[in-house]
Curated annotation (Swiss-Prot):
<keyword id="KW-0689">Ribosomal protein</keyword>
<keyword id="KW-0934">Plastid</keyword>
<dbReference type="GO" id="GO:0019843">
    <property type="term" value="F:rRNA binding"/>
</dbReference>
<dbReference type="GO" id="GO:0006412">
    <property type="term" value="P:translation"/>
</dbReference>
<protein>
    <recommendedName>
        <fullName>Small ribosomal subunit protein uS14c</fullName>
    </recommendedName>
</protein>
<dbReference type="GO" id="GO:0009507">
    <property type="term" value="C:chloroplast"/>
</dbReference>
<comment type="subunit">
    <text>Part of the 30S ribosomal subunit.</text>
</comment>
<dbReference type="Pfam" id="PF00253">
    <property type="entry name" value="Ribosomal_S14"/>
</dbReference>
<dbReference type="GO" id="GO:0003735">
    <property type="term" value="F:structural constituent of ribosome"/>
</dbReference>
<dbReference type="InterPro" id="IPR001209">
    <property type="entry name" value="Ribosomal_uS14"/>
</dbReference>
<keyword id="KW-0687">Ribonucleoprotein</keyword>
<keyword id="KW-0150">Chloroplast</keyword>
<dbReference type="InterPro" id="IPR023036">
    <property type="entry name" value="Ribosomal_uS14_bac/plastid"/>
</dbReference>
<keyword id="KW-0694">RNA-binding</keyword>
<comment type="function">
    <text>Binds 16S rRNA, required for the assembly of 30S particles.</text>
</comment>
<dbReference type="GO" id="GO:0015935">
    <property type="term" value="C:small ribosomal subunit"/>
</dbReference>
<comment type="similarity">
    <text>Belongs to the universal ribosomal protein uS14 family.</text>
</comment>
Length: 100
C-alpha cells in the first residue's frame, strides 16, 4: 500500500493539470504562431510561470486500490497484484485465466 500522502499528491497534480490544460494549450499554440524571437521568449516566460504540477508529464499512473506506481495495467487501472487477486475472485467481468 502506497503512502496516503503520495496518493493525495497525485490527485492534487491531476487537479492542477485539468485546471491549467487550456491555458497551457493556448500558450503553446501562440508560441508556434509567433514570428519574432522576442515574442516567443515572452510567451515561453509566461509558460514557465505556470505551476510545475500543471504539466501532464509530472503525472504518474497509480493503482486505484493500492496506490502502487509500478506494474500498472492501463486497461483496468490496477496494479498487477490487485489485478491477479481480483481475477481469482471473479471481480473483473470478462477476465479469464489462461491455460494451455
Amino acid at each position: 500500500m502506497a503512502k496516503k500522502s503520495m496518493i493525495e499528491r497525485e490527485k492534487k497534480r491531476l487537479k492542477f493539470v485539468t485546471k491549467f490544460k487550456q491555458k497551457r494549450y493556448d500558450l503553446k499554440k501562440q508560441i508556434k504562431k509567433a514570428e519574432f524571437l522576442e515574442e516567443k521568449l515572452s510567451l515561453y516566460a509566461k509558460l514557465q510561470k505556470l505551476p510545475r504540477n500543471s504539466s501532464a508529464v509530472r503525472l504518474h499512473n497509480r493503482c486505484l486500490i493500492s496506490g502502487r506506481p509500478k506494474g500498472y495495467y492501463r486497461d483496468f487501472g490496477l496494479s498487477r497484484h490487485v489485478l491477479r487477486e481480483f481475477g481469482h475472485n471473479c471481480l473483473l467481468p470478462g477476465l479469464t485465466k489462461s491455460s494451455w
